[in-house]
Amino acid sequence: MSRFVTSVSALAMLALAPAALSSGAYANDKLVELSKSDDNWVMPGKNYDSNNFSDLKQINKGNVKQLRPAWTFSTGLLNGHEGAPLVVDGKMYIHTSFPNNTFALGLDDPGTILWQDKPKQNPAARAVACCDLVNRGLAYWPGDGKTPALILKTQLDGNVAALNAETGETVWKVENSDIKVGSTLTIAPYVVKDKVIIGSSGAELGVRGYLTAYDVKTGEQVWRAYATGPDKDLLLASDFNIKNPHYGQKGLGTGTWEGDAWKIGGGTNWGWYAYDPGTNLIYFGTGNPAPWNETMRPGDNKWTMTIFGRDADTGEAKFGYQKTPHDEWDYAGVNVMMLSEQKDKDGKARKLLTHPDRNGIVYTLDRTDGALVSANKLDDTVNVFKSVDLKTGQPVRDPEYGTRMDHLAKDICPSAMGYHNQGHDSYDPKRELFFMGINHICMDWEPFMLPYRAGQFFVGATLNMYPGPKGDRQNYEGLGQIKAYNAITGDYKWEKMERFAVWGGTMATAGDLVFYGTLDGYLKARDSDTGDLLWKFKIPSGAIGYPMTYTHKGTQYVAIYYGVGGWPGVGLVFDLADPTAGLGAVGAFKKLANYTQMGGGVVVFSLDGKGPYDDPNVGEWKSAAK
């Protein structure tokens, strides 16, 4: 693996090891402190709980109708813009789709670009990217007095870079993924202590998934844990799943595969993370096995489709719960992990993790040991599973919707897109409600055999997608929902239909509001208690990212990326017409181009459009000549 790293010598690093540990702890404390400030949005999900919730309430359900654009910024790129910007100490950091440019703006005058990073990438990465050329965001590390504050980014060509947050200069760069075998990067980096955590992409090309921790200051690899293979590669702790041995323990990363199929077995993780400083565990999900054709890979295919809790320092897995053994539908299990502290049905206080999965089930686990607390359908139209057995953790399949070679499965709900995909959802701790964006889409599935060839798609299925039973199948609308969910009772307080899938996710605030963007190009605000639509605004292109909020000089702002794309937008972006193209997405979203077109940028809102340009001097040119 080639890598360019600017750092001190290995000998000096050994001498500095004790200091590095203390400086890492300092930096992590500083990051936690920044995440608690309403002025900032310093990481995906806002904080380590990954709940996309803000205590801000200057904008509330009583005045949200007064929201107006305060300013905008165009990224100059037209592919899908997922994730959200970061705001740290008066600066906004903006990322883009390929070629993964980064911009820093000062919030006093966002019309002036403080710095920009436009990396030179291997264009071959475009050909092996699965589902548009998206990227899910940036990470911030606050520095430790010796190393400056950093912006961490991933590139589609598999590189990870650390930029000086003040100047944009590259501090280090390292190759994480090999595009020659189809391994790319779309994930947002995740900073914990003195490490930056990086996932992987490419399961559709047979890439074996892994999670890597790098020293945030130098780019040196600290540990790497695989999703499949021998226990030593998986970094299974000696007490792995000790509280839940029925989930499986040792030897299964190879023993649940035929021969060496695990070597090209997928399980990449390109979604979202959460972290609990109390348990020191990083929580994330692994993706689908490869190929999609289930006949070609007998067995449970562990540990794809798994929620892992891994020690942040060592990478060791303390627990792993496989949600969909022997996945048959591409239900990649990488979706958002949201942390909460609630009382269970018996009144016992629990530290919980809630995860809405692509397979149509929303799971809640005890995040200290992985014990399953609840597992409920995201919608009553889910038909691949009848239920989940809480004692064994196993889903109860309906064989009618299996995808074996001797059976042409029709009207499978959910589709391969899942009833939930990469959208980053929110949790309101006062209401104990999760606000989730849903893809209400079903499919027909026709499997076929194919050989593995490195760097080529390794799928083995033709898909046709269309609206779910609650949608309009004649007009191909009603493909999405917004829902308010209680993880303890399993009840949905309210749900609202949308024209298209709600792909980007939601943000909740103490102003009794839930914000989200839509594929047809609206930013919307709903009442947290009732789901009533209180406000909407037409933005320049469809939204596949999630909203964020911050304050600057006493004013609350709400920001969202515009830029349709991602898997739902591949037909529009690449001008495709075959309904089975785009791995089935083109047919489902055949009407999308009637409502929006490509774009790329950020729109920032405030009450009455108040902002930096209320000052007539901001943004004006002044001659230096006397």
Curated annotation (Swiss-Prot):
EC number, as in UniProt: 1.1.2.7
From the UniProt annotation, give the residues forming the signal peptide. Answer: 1-27
User: What cofactors does this protein use?
Assistant: pyrroloquinoline quinone; Ca(2+)
Record: residues binding Ca(2+): E204, N288
Mainly localized where? membrane
Q: Does the keyword GTP-binding apply?
A: no
Bound cofactor: record note: Binds 1 PQQ group per subunit. PQQ is inserted between disulfide Cys-130-Cys-131 and the indole ring of Trp-270. Binds 1 Ca(2+) ion per subunit.
Task: Tell me the InterPro entries matching this sequence.
Answer: PQQ_b-propeller_rpt, PQQ_MeOH/EtOH_DH, PQQ_rpt_dom, Quinoprotein_ADH-like_sf, Quinoprotein_DH_CS
Its record classes its membrane topology as: Peripheral membrane protein
Q: Which reactions does this protein catalyse?
A: 2 Fe(III)-[cytochrome cL] + a primary alcohol = 2 Fe(II)-[cytochrome cL] + an aldehyde + 2 H(+)
Q: Per the UniProt entry, what is one GO biological process?
A: methanol metabolic process
Gene3D superfamilies in the cross-refs:
Quinoprotein alcohol dehydrogenase-like superfamily (2.140.10.10)
| Effect of substituting D330E | Lower affinity for methanol
**How is the quaternary structure described?**
Heterotetramer composed of 2 alpha and 2 beta subunits.
The name under which this protein is listed is: Methanol dehydrogenase [cytochrome c] subunit 1
Tell me the organism's taxonomic lineage.
Bacteria, Pseudomonadati, Pseudomonadota, Alphaproteobacteria, Hyphomicrobiales
Q: Which gene name belongs to this protein?
A: moxF
